[in-house]
Amino acid sequence: MKIARVFPRRTKATPDDPLAFTGPPPKGGLPDIEEVHVSVAFTYDMEKACQLTEQWMKLGVPVHMGGPAFNMPGGDFVPGMYLKKGYVITSRGCPNRCWFCSVPRREGGRLRELPITEGNIVLDDNLLACSRQHIKAVFEMLGRQKERPIFTG
């Protein structure tokens, strides 16, 4: 399925493939798409995301809004879908319940280990809370990368 992904703003992590957009539908035409996902990372981008959703709905294809700003549990990680290639998420959640952190509430207070995909920029909520086996596998994957690892959390 061809899915256009729309982001309210461009960041270093925004995908840069032909189906990733940071504004209204382009006037010069659009590849055949079957669905549009408006991905919202920050709550302060909600108003712009709603405007973009209305603009993209005019194409007549299903448009869905989602992302971290909605405070819903994260799903499986698909490389390149909502984050530029090179960024990886190998686990979601955290078993700690720090008063200042929304991760345990968002992810249900548990840690989920995900399949490990190739990349060098690790965005896990709490990688060190994972099993030793998972951490070792992540470090082995990082050892295969041409770029040095970056842990941004």
Residue ranges of predicted features:
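N-terminal pre-triad scaffold of radical SAM enzymes
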Residues: 1-9, 78-108, 118-128
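Core AdoMet radical
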Residues: 5, 37-41, 102-153
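Short catalytic/ligand-binding loop motif for oxyanion handling, primarily in non-cytosolic enzymes
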Residues: 13, 45-47, 71-75, 97-99, ...
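Short, charged low-complexity linear segments at domain edges
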Residues: 65-85
